[in-house]
Amino acid sequence: MPDPALNVAELLDLDRRHVWHPYGPMPGRQDPLVVESASGVRLRPADGSGELVDGMSSWWSAIHGYNHPVLNAAAREQLERMSHVMFGGLTHEPAVRLAKLLVDMSPEGLEHVFLADSGSVSVEVAVKMCLQYWRSLGRPGKHRLLTWRGGYHGDTWQPMSVCDPEGGMHELWSGVLPRQVFADAPPAEYEETYADHLRSMVERHAGELAAVIVEPVVQGAGGMRFHSPAYLRVLREACDAHDVLLVFDEIATGFGRTGALFAAEHAAVTPDVMCVGKALTGGYLTMAATLCTSRVAEGISRGEVPVLAHGPTFMGNPLAAAVACASIGLLLGQDWLAEVKRIETGLGEGLAPAAGLPGVRDVRVLGAIGVVQLDHAVDMRAATKAAVREGVWLRPFRDLVYTMPPYVTGDADVARIARAVCAAAREG
């Protein structure tokens, strides 16, 4: 007999005692919101307290909203064929179709696709590709990574090593993680002195650098900062001049979030390796990908160990791949850029009043991203409650109250989200 349905209090009690939440203690100290269902851009709490407009796209992934009929149909149809099959020695249409879609839509030259389980894993794979590339070429001394401060690349081992080591989410591990090379954080506008700093850092460390890895145009969970695309061209030129690979982490920025399909397009630059995730499946299932050029793939294949020794159990999962294909088709089949620009305009207008609030350091908007930065650590509980009172779900952190809404969010809901961000900044 199945267990009888649990009421909200029972769910929360079990959750508190047994379930570990992201960046949370055990046992839990705060009760999360129990969500019963979601549709469009709205979450329905199980306590009947009223729907909430989702201002977070479930950590930036649900770009089409929830319960979308096209994505639902893709999942159901694939489920009836096969939900999973191992990817070692086997292949299948959803994975092959997805790889071709990614190659066709990505910056020219990225020809090869490794399908991963999550964004962090895709960064692990990217790092492994770069290190193995130089080992295959007989240059094992090129084993370090250069990045700029203020970044975030994930919570597994190598990604943690290229997150900001001072004040970042993984400062606890600074003594045991691989020691990487850090440039200063990029300024918002182009500054030639900073460009020279980047050139100097690449040149100085070229003999030990396997790759430079950065989040292009937008630094995500490290601080939601924006920077000039021109720095990407500076890095491309410096890496080419000094024989260093270039990796772009597009996990947060990919699939239109910044007003370009991939943020690399703002600079007309192709990296040697690119990571994508989050919005890849429209927020339905966990999947990410690492793309690379033929130079990288062929270099690895010429080595003493001519294979990329990485094989997750759920690699190329057909269910996730089928939904990813449907999500990409949905994105490309509409005027996604007009929708992102519409949201950008709405957030720009709606967040402007926040600039006059006490305690607000900066307000910035790019594409479907809106950020209010405070001059103090946000009171997450107070800020979240303020947003919920406005009928909106937000997840502030550090000194930030921000939103990255689904692209299908209507004008009235964009305005509501902006009001909620302002309220959260005021209360938090």
Curated annotation (Swiss-Prot):
Gene Ontology BP terms: biotin biosynthetic process
Q: Which GO terms describe its cellular component?
A: cytoplasm
Q: What class of enzyme is it?
A: transferase
Provide the binding site for pyridoxal 5'-phosphate. Answer: 119-120, 249, 312-313
Main subcellular localisation: cytoplasm
Q: Which PANTHER family match?
A: ADENOSYLMETHIONINE-8-AMINO-7-OXONONANOATE AMINOTRANSFERASE
What function does the entry list? Catalyzes the transfer of the alpha-amino group from S-adenosyl-L-methionine (SAM) to 7-keto-8-aminopelargonic acid (KAPA) to form 7,8-diaminopelargonic acid (DAPA). It is the only aminotransferase known to utilize SAM as an amino donor.
Official protein name in the record: Adenosylmethionine-8-amino-7-oxononanoate aminotransferase
